[in-house]
Each structure stands twice: as structure tokens, then as C-alpha cells.
Regions:
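Hydrophobic N-terminal alpha-helices or hydrophobic patches in metabolic proteins across all domains
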Residues: 1-127
């Protein structure tokens, strides 16, 4: 089953294992029409999905395109996403809870857009 959005990573980030990360770039799911593999776009983070994946913290930034013409939902913050698009939020959550098989990934919880921005800054590679 395909992802419920455009799945990728945030450039210039690395979740350092010594700091509790998974050793990869920060994951992102952009809720938008299908993008080409390798496309880079500006986004607005609207929330963070925190998961336990086989005992390891797995952080997913949820975002929408910054360009209003590319947005398929009119949510640019966590409050609007959870109230106006609660079913979309549940689809994203359920997909990530089941994509590796039943019971492998467990929900820690959702966090807001401010938390998403903090995570992006936390894992940004110093230039």
C-alpha cells in the first residue's frame, strides 16, 4: 500500500544516534498531490507523529506545501489539522502503525507544529 502522502526526509538534518536519534535524516510526510521522486519543496510543518518502532523512537514530521496552490488541505497548524482534518490525521496514524506489520510500530503520540519546528532545529546539521 502506498504512503498517505509524499514521504521523504528533511535535507541538512541528521538524527544523531548519540543524542537518541535513529542515525538517519528526519522523516517527513507532506500531505499533497503526488510529487516526483527527488523533488524539494518548501513546506509548513503542521505536526509531529511520535512512534516506537521496534523499541526505537521514530519521529515523523507532518507538513503541507508552503505554496497554497499545492495544498490539498487548508491546515497550516496542528489545531486546524486535528479539528478540521481529524480523519486525515487518523489515516496517517493508522498507516504508520500498520505499515511494517501488526504490533511492530506503537503510537507514542502526536505533538503540535511548534514541536515539529523544535525537532527540525534540534536535528539540523550545523553549517
Amino acid at each position: 500500500m502506498s504512503y498517505p502522502g509524499n514521504y521523504g526526509f528533511i535535507p541538512s538534518t541528521l538524527m544523531d544516534e548519540e543524542l537518541g536519534g535513529d542515525g538517519d535524516a528526519l522523516d517527513i510526510l507532506v500531505i499533497a498531490e503526488s510529487l516526483e521522486t527527488g523533488d524539494t519543496i518548501s513546506v509548513i510543518p503542521i505536526g509531529t507523529l511520535l512512534l516506537n518502532d521496534s523499541g526505537e523512537l521514530d519521529t515523523k514530521i507532518i507538513a503541507v506545501p508552503a505554496d497554497p496552490k499545492k495544498q490539498v488541505i487548508q491546515a497550516t497548524d496542528y489545531q486546524t489539522f486535528t479539528v478540521k482534518y481529524n480523519m486525515a490525521q487518523r489515516i496517517v496514524e493508522n498507516w504508520f502503525l500498520n505499515y511494517k506489520g501488526l504490533g511492530i510500530t506503537k503510537l507514542i503520540g502526536w505533538r503540535n507544529d511548534a514541536f515539529a519546528m523544535q525537532e527540525i532545529e534540534k536535528w539540523r546539521i550545523p553549517q
